[in-house]
Amino acid sequence: MSELNEMQKLAWAGFAGGDWQENVNVRDFIQKNYTPYEGDDSFLAGPTEATTKLWESVMEGIKIENRTHAPLDFDEHTPSTIISHAPGYINKDLEKIVGLQTDEPLKRAIMPFGGIKMVEGSCKVYGRELDPKVKKIFTEYRKTHNQGVFDVYTPDILRCRKSGVLTGLPDAYGRGRIIGDYRRVALYGVDFLMKDKYAQFSSLQKDLEDGVNLEATIRLREEIAEQHRALGQLKQMAASYGYDISNPATNAQEAIQWMYFAYLAAIKSQNGAAMSFGRTATFIDVYIERDLKAGKITETEAQELVDHLVMKLRMVRFLRTPEYDQLFSGDPMWATETIAGMGLDGRTLVTKNTFRILHTLYNMGTSPEPNLTILWSEQLPENFKRFCAKVSIDTSSVQYENDDLMRPDFNNDDYAIACCVSPMIVGKQMQFFGARANLAKTLLYAINGGIDEKLGMQVGPKTAPITDEVLDFDTVMTRMDSFMDWLAKQYVTALNVIHYMHDKYSYEAALMALHDRDVYRTMACGIAGLSVAADSLSAIKYAKVKPVRGDIKDKDGNVVATNVAIDFEIEGEYPQYGNNDNRVDDIACDLVERFMKKIQKLKTYRNAVPTQSVLTITSNVVYGKKTGNTPDGRRAGAPFGPGANPMHGRDQKGAVASLTSVAKLPFAYAKDGISYTFSIVPNALGKDAEAQRRNLAGLMDGYFHHEATVEGGQHLNVNVLNREMLLDAMENPDKYPQLTIRVSGYAVRFNSLTKEQQQDVITRTFTESM
């Protein structure tokens, strides 16, 4: 082992050594130094006076945002970079963890590298004009990601975007879904990481000179140079707050602060749709435990550090357009913190700090950010399981993902969730985010020969429409299969263009600087409208579905398409997804597998491995608006079921049947995640608090139960609340300033939703029996 320098000796005193001291290996550090905790929550401390004062100050701004549905303030003059803004504070004298995206709390910045039109539109919507100098620079001199994408898009892709058969593509905003290993800055200090990056850069010289994979080698060398530069700027930004982060952190406060500065660099330089925080709780616990044992801090002070970190994560803001908000409602950032789970060696990764992170929901009230994500295992300590159930019942603010499914799949216990349901190994994998394709609309294209049922224009391949008086399942399925081939090709082509241009014009240097040199990439496609498509095909197969044909007119009343199936008459009953009926559940599983296999056949940018999610965020409302009447009886414009959820009100056999249907969806063909949002009224869980906690924990054990022959569910949002409370919150928002609920893949402050989105949430199934 090489000799440690004096700063490393000081910072690492008392830690068990290992490979982590020679190489960047945070997992090795954690495994050799963390303390599993199987006790209860009785050790937890309440908020300090400083925490309460700071949070009250922040809440004043949040209340204004909720009321106005607008930013508190934004800077329309300064393109945001790691070092663009002067230091900002809530109250410098009270903050234990410092750092804001701009110079004022909740003030937003502009990020024009992704696209100048979106920035200009955001400014205009909120009554300001983008600085003309910025517009000139990013129009005449500096090409943006958005411009690059639209220079290359095909007419077919543009039609798919217009119709809504592809929606939410990250072609005008930051793609996100990349998790920097922010822990590295705390463990090693920036100087060590810069030296490591220079070694990576130098390691490519021979390949460069020999012409090995020439274009890829040149690109990677340039990217590493940008990463090295970003680390230098990170150091500069931290220095503006009075901190020298050249060397490793020496105590818990520094470890949290160093780590947060690294994340702050990411969110100052990128406005990705999901800017996840990673898996930090157990790492932080190592430092807190060392300080507690040395008598340097008390439990109250430890909790205060965690509260102040979480407070900062609650304050992340980006300037968005109303169109973006329709897709991703309620200002989500997906500052996802992944906690708990089990280690490969059988020890739990639950620590006291896992409890502290969840306890912030009590010390500062509920909040949608950070997106607290619990990796559930049947082997988790019983005390922790009961505490999780208590938190869900009290706050409806956390989500659960199946560690027993994903840990063996990765053969790794240091993965985290990006955004909502997307797992990746921290610092070693990244994702090319791909939004989602509309399977319900694809089915209508199959029936109508590629004519869009809303616009009347030819979007899909021009084929003869199905003219049968009663739809035949085999005929429809054959056509559907062909249209899924077409859609997969349009989808992957669009994503290849998007991610080539994002790498070229809006590269995430600050995030990728905290990754290994050679990164495993996934191309994360997605599907929406699964339950609509499955129920529609079930209706065609098991009932009688007669198309009602008619003309489609444009907004001026001109006929643009004739003899199009614009509605459907259904005779008889049909099995509906969400009731543990294999007749329809098998159709849903087939659609997932079928579309994934089609995507897997196609060539991807940077040889990214194709994956797929069943996830909608809140775009289930937008998709519904863009999709006409469907053969399952759903009316034109009505929202889809979110994520992998059954359609609203169709899961009629109770919680277990609904959960069982969703758990059947094959993770092997949806490794980017399968989102299920579950709402249950408190009384359905039990008559008293103890019974409710026990039953909810048991329900999750059952849903996530995983073995070789029976796959467990992958994801579960849990809401425990009554519909009446949500109705009251719609009418009296001031009574519920922090009311938080789970929606597809994330949490949202109920008051930040539009009335239409609130109504969609209220009309969803609230399970009243197990």
From Swiss-Prot:
A single GO CC term for this protein reads:
cytosol
Q: Which residues form the PFL domain?
A: 5-635
Q: Which residues carry this modification: Glycine radical?
A: G745
Presence of the UniProt keyword Transmembrane helix in the record: no
Keywords of the record:
Acyltransferase, Carbohydrate metabolism, Cytoplasm, Glucose metabolism, Organic radical, Transferase
Q: Where does the record say this protein resides?
A: Cytoplasm
What protein am I looking at? Formate acetyltransferase
